[in-house]
């Protein structure tokens, strides 16, 4: 990079806790959410998951407090199709005060997005959204 060049940010890859069972967390992300494990550590301490250009690092860490305080927002094109895909995976409805995975309602927001949230097995909340034109 030359002295006059400005840095360009390309991607953000969050690291999130897997919860009590790394194998179950991997299965949830692969089978329910459609991610692919691009890398799995031999000792299963972490895995790099990918779907499209989005990457998530899943850590073999059981920390319910951290998980419940972690949330991600993933922007995409085709939020309606993704919501239908996740409904077909029989992810149970999202309830605020219930542990376990959950699927939130698809809604339009006042800030110009159409979105829904998924809570994973550890309690991490992931919002999938599309900007409305």
Model-derived regions, located:
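Short glycine-enriched loop/turn motifs at secondary-structure junctions
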Residues: 7-10, 64-69, 110
């Amino acid at each position: 990079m030359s002295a006059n060049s400005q840095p360009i940010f390309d991607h953000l890859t969050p690291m999130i806790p897997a919860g009590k069972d790394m194998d179950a967390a991997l299965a949830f992300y692969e089978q329910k959410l459609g991610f692919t494990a691009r890398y799995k550590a031999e000792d299963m301490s972490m895995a790099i998951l990918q779907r499209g250009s989005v990457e998530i690092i899943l850590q073999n860490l059981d920390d319910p407090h951290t998980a419940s305080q972690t949330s991600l927002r993933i922007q995409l094109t085709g939020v309606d199709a993704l919501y239908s895909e996740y409904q077909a995976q029989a992810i149970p409805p999202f309830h605020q005060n219930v542990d376990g995975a959950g699927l939130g309602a698809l809604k339009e927001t006042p800030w110009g997005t159409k979105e829904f949230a998924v809570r994973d097995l550890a309690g991490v909340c992931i919002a999938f959204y599309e900007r409305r034109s």
